[in-house]
């Protein structure tokens, strides 16, 4: 509670300061920004990180990506221009942000900011097989149980329902596209029976080996290592199993 009060006091002081500057008819002499992806303007473009906003639809209102994790201006850009500035605060790491230009302000915020020089680094190697299985098979069970235990979270439950529908639609579309792509090369990959080889032995070649996974509750899920002749059938089976978990 005390930390919340302190934050409100800081925000109130900043609002009063900027309001006083505007009433006095003075321009803000400089604007220095610290934060994360909410206010970043392109510092990550100059860092060795995967967290970059240098592709569409980011920056679509500018006509091209600017390094902002948004379609247009950040909240700091909007406030700064509303206070009378004609320019946007440049990223500190940009090669052009040098010399006297820094005296007018600079943006030091990187997306995914943290104590390291490379923000947003991946940590897939640190995940255990159990965590990966939970993400693959257990989310559909775990999420409703989690939200049902939270009293009064109707908004969260509504959002969960929307996400569930979107996830189901994505799985259906993905399964159709996979089945369509696999069906195109099925006829070319089928082994042909030669003289002296019975059709039963060819079918034996097509029999896939099995590999075992467990869902979030430890129940075995058996999926074969697919050969071309069975890919379409098992693509449909995987989609059916996931939708009915």
Swiss-Prot record:
Keyword list, A-Z: Hydrolase, Lipid degradation, Lipid metabolism, Secreted, Signal
Full protein name: GDSL esterase/lipase At4g16220
UniProt subcellular location: Secreted
Organism: Arabidopsis thaliana
Top enzyme category: hydrolase
Listed GO CC annotations: extracellular region
Keyword Hydrolase: yes
Family: Belongs to the 'GDSL' lipolytic enzyme family.
InterPro entries noted in UniProt: GDSL_esterase/lipase, SGNH_hydro_sf
Coiled-coil segments: none
């Amino acid at each position: 509670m005390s930390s919340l009060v302190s934050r409100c006091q800081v925000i109130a002081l900043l609002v009063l300061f900027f309001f006083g500057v505007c009433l006095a008819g003075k321009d803000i002499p400089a604007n220095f920004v610290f934060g994360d992806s909410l206010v970043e303007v392109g510092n990550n473009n100059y860092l060795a990180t995967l967290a970059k906003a240098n592709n569409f639809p980011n920056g679509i209102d500018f006509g091209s990506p600017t390094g902002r994790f948004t379609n247009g201006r950040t909240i700091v850009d909007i406030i700064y221009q509303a206070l009378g500035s004609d320019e946007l605060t440049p990223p500190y790491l940009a090669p052009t942000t040098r010399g006297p230009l820094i005296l007018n302000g600079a943006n030091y915020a990187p997306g995914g900011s943290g104590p390291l020089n490379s923000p947003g680094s991946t940590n897939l190697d640190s995940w255990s097989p159990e965590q990966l299985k939970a993400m693959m098979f257990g989310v559909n069970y775990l999420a409703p149980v989690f939200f049902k235990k939270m009293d009064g979270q109707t908004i969260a439950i509504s959002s969960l329902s929307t996400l569930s529908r979107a996830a189901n639609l994505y799985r259906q579309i993905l399964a159709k596209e996979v089945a369509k792509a696999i069906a195109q090369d099925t006829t070319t990959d089928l082994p042909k029976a030669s003289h002296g080889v019975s059709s039963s032995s060819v079918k034996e070649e097509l029999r896939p080996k099995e590999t075992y996974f467990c869902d979030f509750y430890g129940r075995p899920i058996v999926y074969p290592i697919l050969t071309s002749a069975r890919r379409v059938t098992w693509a449909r089976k995987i989609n059916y199993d996931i939708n009915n978990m």
